[in-house]
Amino acid sequence: MGQQSSVRRLKRSVPCESNEANEANEANKTMPETPTGDSDPQPAPKKMKTSESSTILVVRYRRNVKRTSPEELLNDHARENRINPDQMEEEEFIEITTERPKK
């Protein structure tokens, strides 16, 4: 059998300069500097006062309409291209509204 070489690892009391540079780079990656040059986090913005009025959310979507013939389908596409969706009949759409309760 051949000779086995033993490797001794000594701990350094002072870290290597390249390690210090790597640690500094890692710190910069995790905490970016602010425009003023410091890395302190900014305080959270204050909450704005809510208005007294209710919020209304309107969601409009077209219902699926059954068509029996290709001619009806072609006529419907031509109609959709001519008419603005806001001008279509109300019964073709479902409207959902929500209101925020007053506090």
From Swiss-Prot:
InterPro entries for the chain: SPAN-X_fam
Taxonomy, superkingdom: Eukaryota
UniProt-listed GO biological process terms: spermatid development
Keyword set includes Cytoplasm: yes
Tissue: Detected in testis and sperm.
Motif, Nuclear localization signal: chain positions: 43-51
Comp. bias regions, Basic and acidic residues: 68-83
Cell compartments where the protein resides: Cytoplasm; Nucleus
GO cellular component: cytoplasm; nucleus
Biased composition annotated in UniProt, kind: Low complexity: 19-28
Record keywords: Cytoplasm, Nucleus
Residue span of region Disordered: 1-103
Protein family per UniProt: Belongs to the SPAN-X family.
Name of the featured protein: Sperm protein associated with the nucleus on the X chromosome B1
Taxonomic source organism: Homo sapiens (Human)
Organism taxonomic ancestry: Eukaryota, Metazoa, Chordata, Craniata, Vertebrata
Gene that specifies this protein: SPANXB1
